[in-house]
Amino acid sequence: MRVADFSFELPDSLIARHPLAERHGSRLLVLDGPTGALAHRQFPDLLDYLRPGDLMVFNNTRVIPARLFGQKASGGKLEVLVERVLDSHRVLAHVRASKAPKVGAVILIDGGGEAEMVARHDTLFELRFTEEVLPLLDRVGHMPLPPYIDRPDEGADRERYQTVYAQRAGAVAAPTAGLHFDEALLEKIADKGVERAFVTLHVGAGTFQPVRVDKIEDHHMHKEWLEVGQDVVDAIEACRARGGRVIAVGTTSVRSLESAARDGVLKAFSGDTDIFIYPGRPFHVVDALVTNFHLPESTLLMLVSAFAGYPETMAAYAAAVEHGYRFFSYGDAMFITRNPAPRGPEDQA
């Protein structure tokens, strides 16, 4: 299966670089996986597609202001993007500089604070800060907007590049399907008799990395930390018992649940995952999906194609471009029901 099979033309004007005035103001493209039928709706119309007894699973990770600017004590500006918080004072980070800092180098952070480079792990640097990491990031860090947004972060991004239900700090990218939900919509969903559960997957910067191989099967995913608690397992079992559907809000929720059910049986799980879901991979847990529109040739588009079927997904994306939907993190959304017999690119006549 070729990465190029997942390419499509996207006008630059359709890339959403700012959020809408209201979280729920987005459009919603509904894709019925079994038939491929499309419906053009508004995001609050999601309520029309939910049923009493359904279970919605959200990712409650909280985006940290993970981008820092500073300079080496010896001179030379640099940029730090925290990838993972290891403990109260240590992180793994990407460092962009004209010359990479050496072990033992001291980094002076703009706004106050400093860190020492204590080790290098392949492309990541282990940094030890002189003060606690999370308060430092809150004080002087910048929100790590995706590269395609192509602008400096603004004060409003601290609120809008964050879900209203974010709890556990650690992500360096937002689980963007959740950005469409405000408290009023969540209350209406609950009033309809739809249950909710929360997993945690700390989204890493690797989510924006392009696939650099020609064949999908040769790609290796970056690792991200996740937790699916026993309470989620119990909620899903109860949902199944009452005939409800498991609806994942975002691809990170899908990857969390399917990682915890890799052997076909859902179990509580806490640890790293590198699960790569592409056409041909089965789904053991998720019945429906709320998701944003993803980049061409991205692993997330491959996941959606595995869920809805390749021809159905690519036809939906072509329709989204034709109808002027807004793409990527601050863009519009889809609601997709799983295709029980999805076809891949190789199945096309």
From Swiss-Prot:
Task: Outline the subunit composition.
Answer: Monomer.
Tagged with keyword S-adenosyl-L-methionine: yes
Pathway membership of this protein? Answer: tRNA modification; tRNA-queuosine biosynthesis
> What compartments host this protein?
Cytoplasm
Q: Under what name is this protein listed?
A: S-adenosylmethionine:tRNA ribosyltransferase-isomerase
Protein's job:
Transfers and isomerizes the ribose moiety from AdoMet to the 7-aminomethyl group of 7-deazaguanine (preQ1-tRNA) to give epoxyqueuosine (oQ-tRNA).
GO molecular function terms here? S-adenosylmethionine:tRNA ribosyltransferase-isomerase activity
Check the record and name the InterPro entries matching this protein: QueA, QueA_dom1, QueA_dom2, QueA_sf
